[in-house]
Amino acid sequence: MLRFALLAVLACLAFAADRGTLRAGAARVDITPAPGAALPMSGYANRTEGFKAIHDNIYARAIVLDDGTTQAAIVAWELIFVPSKVWEELSQRISREAGIRSENLLVAAVHDHGAPSLAGGSTPASPATEAYTKKVEDAAVQAVLEAKAHLQPARFGLATGTASVNVNRRELTTDRGWWLGHNENGPSDKTLAVLRFEDLSGKPIAFLLNYAVHAVVMGPSNYQITGDLAGAASRFVEQFYSGKLQPRSDGGDRLRLRPQEKVGGDGPVVLFTSGAAGDQNPVAMASGEDFTLVNALGQILGEQAVRVDGNIKTNPQARLWGMQQVVTCPGRRVDEGPRPRTQYTFSDADPVPIRLGLLMLDNVALAGVSGEVLTMISQRLKRESPYSQTLMITHANGSSGYIPDDAAYDQVSYEITTTRLKPGCAEGAIVNGFLDMMRRY
């Protein structure tokens, strides 16, 4: 018993010795397409034209971290995917130009259905999409380089709250079986996680928000560029800490900005990341091009993020560590396109690679998955993880499509008729893959 206790103490001392003084920097770069660019919009197959107007600008945001021996970067952009080809090219560029190794890099999309498509996905290639993809890649590299140039001594901390902005969308209907709908009894993770980085005076440098919801408040009849509720949430928090917003005084004490936290300018950089939202839609969605709900739901998330921030305790000491691996699962092709039904057939197809990226910031585990993960996989990982502060960031470092949990295949829903994965592999491969990497930390 004494021997094991001594080993535990030595392990803790070794971990503490590896920790260094944290430095953090952040930046945002505009990736809004030029007005009139001939670009298709992403996410809805029944759109017949490219975007026609710009409602709100969209951004690539980056946080760069340094513990004295290791540097890491997190990039989040207000687009639908990170195509695997784009990840490969971008990770090499960031490694080459910023000196940040790919195993310490997470590049994630908020899964915005109100943004242009990138080349390398399902959208047919065109000179316009190729040019826009180059613009986005350049912007991401620029954001990382600017964030690195702004590195400064920092403290960090994480806290969680809840927000009732999402709802399970897999609904059992009487005539069509399971399909897209509104299922308040279905599994849904309401956790809103807020990771704060501040300078040594207490002013926020950046935030990372993590919440499981499709960025689809605006539907297929919308032809205006928007960051949807993800962009609205980031914008609210940025403007709050810049001092540009003055919420009602009866919204709670935390919504009164303290002078020492006022950043000014454009405020701190706020990255929104999508949790396991493959089966999670906004609790309310818009018709046509009315953006009222985008702003309302974004503000609900933003206000709650500010309230959660009030509970965060920060620490200047940190250890950074990253690792990535690719797990491969048997593939399939559903014989007919997605439509409501109770049965379907499929053919064998190529195996599907799923990239897992684990970024550890002390005892905070950021688990990136290259796909559209259903909620129960994330909930299982959080239960089994040895780290209580475990966040799943989806649409990260590639695009493997829908990733259902094993039990979900029994309900023939939209996600099941579009996934490229056979059942029985991905859930275990993802959870066990992350647990294995955590053991190596």
Language-model regions, residue ranges each:
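Conserved beta-alpha junction segments in alpha/beta enzyme cores
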Residues: 17-108, 115-269, 273-277, 285-299, ...
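Charged, flexible cofactor/metal-binding loops and thiol motifs
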Residues: 302
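Sec-dependent signal peptide recognition
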Residues: 1-7
